[in-house]
A protein has these predicted regions:
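Terminal targeting signals and extreme-terminal segments of soluble enzymes
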Residues: 1-111
Length: 111
């Protein structure tokens, strides 16, 4: 699978995604790819297409290639202007990547 196909699988709500070995270095899938996939899962839960304003990513453990990865997204708060979400990428029931994000609507400003 190429990058677009992996994102499309997450966007399409696949139960799990398998990252091919070509997207790995050693025993772990590339961190940037894991961040992108988890971000895409989180974006699906954001109201009104609010853009990301901040992200904090923790690579908890290596995401092994060729092993199914599932994504869980929890909406911590949906406020009037900002949504705060927590995303988890899991393999074999263990968290491999954790992401907290704030997605906020723009504000009018004269600055």
């Amino acid at each position: 699978m190429n990058f677009s196909q992996l994102l499309a699988a997450v966007r399409g709500g696949e139960a799990s995604v398998i990252v091919p070995a070509s997207w790995a270095q050693g025993r772990a899938s590339f961190g940037g790819l894991m961040a992108a996939l988890l971000f895409e899962a989180m974006r699906q839960k954001v109201v009104d297409g609010r853009p990301a304003r901040s992200l904090a990513i923790t690579f908890v453990g290596p995401a092994a290639p060729e092993v199914p990865i599932t994504f869980e997204v929890e909406v911590l708060r949906d406020g009037k202007a900002v949504s705060t979400l927590l995303g988890r990428a899991l393999q074999n029931g263990e968290v491999v990547t954790l992401m907290q994000g704030s997605f906020g609507a723009g504000r009018e400003s004269v600055v």
